[in-house]
Design a protein with these regions (language model features):
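Intrinsically disordered, charged and Pro/Gly-enriched terminal/linker segments
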Residues: 5, 9, 24-31, 50-151
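Short amphipathic alpha-helical recognition elements used for nucleic-acid or partner binding
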Residues: 1-23, 41, 102
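DNA-recognition element of transcription regulators
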Residues: 1-5, 27-46
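Generic structural marker for isolated residues within well-ordered, non-membrane alpha-helices
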Residues: 20, 38, 150
Length: 151
């Protein structure tokens, strides 16, 4: 989950060394661990006619075109401006939030990943609050749905 999330949210391909430093202890075999995790991800993500994991040179990227990933949908909407979204889109986005970002995932021996994870959780929490704020402002004041979102 950690590897997928990091690659999915990365704006560009990520170096293998960076991923190894981020996710694994150096004394172990981080490149071996990375290869193993990539093989597991390929089994889940790749389609018969499309490889979703791209490994140009010494970097790794995900090809998620045509795939709906909640975190990417939220980040994309935030980049365009939450205040510009209509009521239906705000409702759809608010439904994507279920707990914290990568809830339950902690990697004790990876302080760099944990720092990234905390930053992402703060970012998504902020977006969630903004989405709910704009959603409630667009609902009629007597809407039953308003109390659900205000909670």
């Amino acid at each position: 989950r950690a590897l997928f999330a990091y690659l999915a949210l990365a704006p560009h391909a990520v170096g293998r060394s960076r991923l190894c430093e981020l996710l694994w202890d150096v004394p172990n075999d981080p490149r071996g661990e990375l290869r193993w995790c990539l093989s597991k991800l390929r089994g889940v993500l790749d389609e018969p006619d499309r490889r979703r994991i791209e490994t140009p040179g010494d970097t790794i990227a995900l090809d998620l075109k045509g795939v709906s990933v909640d975190a990417i949908d939220i980040a994309s909407a935030a980049a365009k401006g939450i205040e510009t979204l209509d009521l239906q889109r705000l409702q759809a986005l608010s439904g994507l939030f279920v707990g914290d970002f990568l809830d339950g995932l902690e990697i004790d021996r990876s302080p760099h990943f944990n720092s990234w994870l905390i930053a992402q959780r703060r970012r998504f929490s902020s977006w969630h609050a903004a989405i709910l704020e704009h959603l409630v402002s667009k609902l009629p004041t007597d809407a039953d749905e308003m109390s659900t979102h205000l909670e």
